[in-house]
Amino acid sequence: MDATTCIRTKRDSRAYTAVPVPEESLQSILQAGRMAGSSKNTQPCRYVVLRDAKRKEEVAACGQFATPMLAAPLAIAIVLAPGGGAFDAGRAAQNMMLAAWEQGITSCPVAMHDRDCAARELGLPGDHAVAMVIAFGYPESEQSRHRNVPRTPLAELVHQERW
């Protein structure tokens, strides 16, 4: 699918089948994150792959709305090395979610509200921080993939030169 179609049709999914995400797809998703631009090309994003149900449960306990991680066969924590910022993590996350969707794999970003807890559960070095975790999997139903989500008209969002 072309980039514009991928962007327009991607929806967050919170219900997944138990079908595992193939290793080839995982590598493609991770490569998409790696290829994201970063401030001053610092490339601060690191990734922790979570497939084990118990590990996902322990990490999910660090977020307030992290249940999508429990249902997904795969989750990837985006970790920031020193000097990395949310801007860098966001660019990597969007690349990863779009690369997944191109393969029919849905996703849902999850915030880790207790970052110290998440860092402990993931065994991070003291100077690294969890930016977010993304749940990945095949959608439980076709309906969840194709629902129409209304968007604010572009004319209401865009201003030229000044507000």
Locations of the language-model features?
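Acidic, surface-exposed loops and disordered segments
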Residues: 1-163
